[in-house]
Amino acid sequence: MRTNSTTSGPGVPTLEKKNLGRIAQIIGPVLDVAFPPGKMPNIYNALIVTGQDTTGQPINVTCEVQQLLGNNRVRAVAMSATDGLMRGMEVIDTGAPLSVPVGGATLGRIFNVLGEPVDNLGPVDTRTTSPIHRSAPAFTQLDTKLSIFETGIKVVDLLAPYRRGGKIGLFGGAGVGKTVLIMELINNIAKAHGGVSVFGGVGERTREGNDLYMEMKESGVINEQNIAESKVALVYGQMNEPPGARMRVGLTALTMAEYFRDVNEQDVLLFIDNILRFVQAGSEVSALLGRMPSAVGYQPTLSTEMGSLQERITSTKEGSITSIQAVYVPADDLTDPAPATTFAHLDATTVLSRGLAAKGIYPAVDPLDSTSTMLQPRIVGEEHYEIAQRVKQTLQRYKELQDIIAILGLDELSEEDRLTVARARKIERFLSQPFFVAEVFTGSPGKYVGLAETIRGFQLIFSGELDGLPEQAFYLVGNIDEVTAKAMNLEMESKLKK
């Protein structure tokens, strides 16, 4: 892995004023810069504009070269606000792409797209940096072992299991619980696996980023007393930042994760929230650069940009990067080019349903729409596969019967169908689960349920032993033993009321 050991600051290699240009034009976050003949910077080189604005305030803006225009001009996209910049200002070509700090010193810290710490905890204690633009690992370096990554969330582990070193997409519209599910996964994985995580906040709400940071401090994932014991590095390029920053912040987070995989030889978790904002930022930049839009107004380079990010997220013989990506689905339309392009790269999809969220079933994971390439008997075993298929068949039959129930009522169903409906409603509720990160809001303590416990629970439901229990007993519990305990409590309460 290519790293630099000398820098003058996180985002920029050592500056030697050998290649200077001047700003010729400014259009929002896009700068046209004129350089002397024969001194043109390369595509993706970092350019730095320093100086003072009209009020005497210092200016330090980093840009990235995107196009060579001819006539000794380049077009670059700024990574921060361009307020105060003027034509004629001096621009320094750093001669290299953006580089960010990597290694153990990044854990417990919050960075921006340039790799500068933004948490007011002082400079990062590392001299090792790495460029954010790299090629994906060669075929000969890839690892092809298939193993399950247990999350402790029943519906995920049973019906759409995650692959260790795979790519997982969380699909859902606005407000169905993507970010809460990501926070729960970070919490469970840090506690159960002791793994290192990198979180890339791409174009999401600043408030959510702040909430996540506070939540991590409370749960001990970030250790304030001893920052070196923290389990996660955070990289934010939020909604209020220019499109250049939002387009590149995913690469900054990925570069930090790659170092843990390639040099430290660790298994790493990379969370990206939200991959659609990465696409949207690319679309904005594409329009600013004057490219003709493609389908639904997206950039013509959508597949290429997505591929350059996704192909670097993989397992090598040194270690693995397991990536969990939230994918906002515009207007709940899964055929939109952005989610459709993302689908092609994923090993598992966790689809969040507005219908389940409206019923109050959380996590609102749709058991029929969520998929995984890992759900095969040779990988998960016959027992797991059989139970998962029975759960899906029961829920599918319930879905088919809902129209009949709505028109004619339950009484018109056959005895067999009535039993199917009763069990399906219990399964639906048993797939809900109290989360550790939602304890503050729900008042229920979070539950981590191992895969073996989950399978045992559904076996008991299908055996008929629990047919007499009320369906409320299955709602927001951990394992099946809690269901019987809750049913007894409900029975006691109803007797006391009488």
Curated annotation (Swiss-Prot):
GO terms for biological process, alphabetical: proton motive force-driven mitochondrial ATP synthesis
UniProt KW Translocase keyword: yes
Catalytic activity: ATP + H2O + 4 H(+)(in) = ADP + phosphate + 5 H(+)(out)
SUPFAM superfamilies: C-terminal domain of alpha and beta subunits of F1 ATP synthase, N-terminal domain of alpha and beta subunits of F1 ATP synthase, P-loop containing nucleoside triphosphate hydrolases
Pfam families for this protein: ATP-synt_ab (PF00006), ATP-synt_ab_N (PF02874), ATP-synt_VA_C (PF22919)
EC numbers: 7.1.2.2
GO cellular component, as recorded: chloroplast thylakoid membrane; mitochondrion; proton-transporting ATP synthase complex
Subcellular location: Plastid, Chloroplast thylakoid membrane
GO molecular function, one term: ATP binding
Quaternary state and interactors: F-type ATPases have 2 components, CF(1) - the catalytic core - and CF(0) - the membrane proton channel. CF(1) has five subunits: alpha(3), beta(3), gamma(1), delta(1), epsilon(1). CF(0) has four main subunits: a(1), b(1), b'(1) and c(9-12).
UniProt xrefs under HAMAP family: ATP_synth_beta_bact
Family: Belongs to the ATPase alpha/beta chains family.
Protein name per Swiss-Prot or TrEMBL: ATP synthase subunit beta, chloroplastic
